[in-house]
């Protein structure tokens, strides 16, 4: 197995160093590719000063899927792993990855543990059955693909600002590529998030949800029901925050407008993308769609 590890980053200097240190220790011999968005925190200088990075690709786009695809393009391994810049791979990570791909799986993932006051918590693999298709979701910052699977997918869909990993899970299911789960392929997240969303982020979330469901399955009752179910449950939860005094009615209404607008845009754009790529890979905005992602490239191989 020739392993390449792609680390997409944007203003992640504070945590990226620990990510790279762990890869050097726990995945020795792996080709390491850092795909850096338009960072303003000195990430490029920090990476150039290290001797354990093989390729640094700079991209001008802030979208995570663009950085992922730029890194995948630069990688040469027959297995390509994606590791988030805020994750530290654990002991035995590489061995668990190799073991999973030695079987029938073409993709493998594992838990991403978060530091919380009560200790470390890990997500279990999430599986759903949608329109007769069994979908296994994966952790986008802790996943490895055989090159053949990535080629069949044409990488990630660059239309998506968020939800790129979930979209890819739907497309893997359509292409009949199994996804393995290995608890030993674990990574640890040292930095948490605030858990909140702005009105604009609500819009992006629901544009992504509507887009990927419509693109992958078309407009059908199952799709409509899932979109409305998600939106309805979160509308009720946010309304309760207003009642408790944790939010204000204007914020609730503003978020609601963004959600409705995001759904409308996502449905429309999903239909266009579905028509543009009628193959099971459903990726009109993949790696092969453009070759101008990188604005600079440093190759020390």
Residue ranges and their predicted role:
Residues 10-26:
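Short, well-formed alpha-helical segments that are part of the catalytic scaffolds
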Residues 14-18, 41-49, 92:
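Acidic helix N-cap motif at the loop->helix transition within catalytic regions
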Residues 88-120:
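Conserved donor NDP-sugar-binding/catalytic core segment of glycosyltransferases
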Residues 45, 58-75, 96:
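Glycine-rich, basic loop-to-helix element that forms the pyrophosphate-binding segment
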Residues 80:
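Short aromatic/hydrophobic "clamp" motif used to bind/position activated sugar donors
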Residues 201-208, 218-301:
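Non-catalytic, C-terminal membrane-associated alpha-helical segments of glycosyltransferases
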Residues 2-4, 31, 167:
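Cell-envelope/extracellular polymer assembly enzymes that use nucleotide-activated donors
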Residues 142-145, 149-154, 159-186:
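A short, conserved alpha-helix in the catalytic core of glycosyltransferases
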């Amino acid at each position: 197995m020739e392993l390449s590890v792609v680390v997409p980053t944007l203003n992640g200097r504070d945590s990226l160093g620990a990510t790279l240190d762990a890869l050097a220790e726990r995945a020795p011999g792996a080709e390491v590719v850092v795909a850096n968005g338009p960072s303003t925190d000195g990430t490029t200088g920090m990476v150039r000063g290290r001797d354990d990075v093989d390729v640094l690709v700079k991209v001008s786009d802030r979208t995570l899927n663009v950085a992922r695809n730029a890194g995948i393009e630069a990688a040469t391994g027959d297995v390509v792993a994606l590791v988030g810049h805020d994750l530290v791979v654990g002991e035995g990570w590489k061995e668990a990855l190799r073991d999973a791909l030695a079987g029938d799986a073409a993709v493998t993932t594992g838990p991403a543990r978060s530091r919380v006051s009560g200790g470390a918590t890990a997500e279990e693999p999430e599986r759903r059955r949608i329109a007769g298709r069994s979908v296994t979701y994966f952790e986008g910052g802790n996943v490895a693909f055989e090159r053949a699977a990535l080629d069949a997918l044409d990488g990630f869909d660059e239309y998506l600002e968020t939800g790129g990993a979930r979209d890819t899970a739907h497309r893997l299911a359509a292409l009949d590529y199994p996804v393995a789960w290995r608890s030993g392929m674990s990574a640890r997240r040292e930095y948490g998030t605030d858990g909140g969303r702005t009105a604009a982020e609500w819009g992006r979330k629901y544009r992504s949800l509507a887009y990927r469901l419509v693109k992958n399955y078309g407009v059908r009752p199952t799709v409509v029901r899932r979109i409305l179910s998600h939106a309805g449950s979160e509308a009720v939860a946010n309304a309760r925050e207003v009642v408790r005094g944790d939010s204000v009615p204007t914020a609730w209404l503003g978020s609601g407008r963004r959600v409705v607008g995001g759904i409308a845009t996502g449905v429309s754009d999903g239909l266009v993308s579905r028509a543009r790529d009628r193959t099971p890979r459903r990726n009109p905005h993949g790696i092969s769609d453009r070759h101008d992602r990188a604005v600079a490239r440093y190759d020390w191989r």
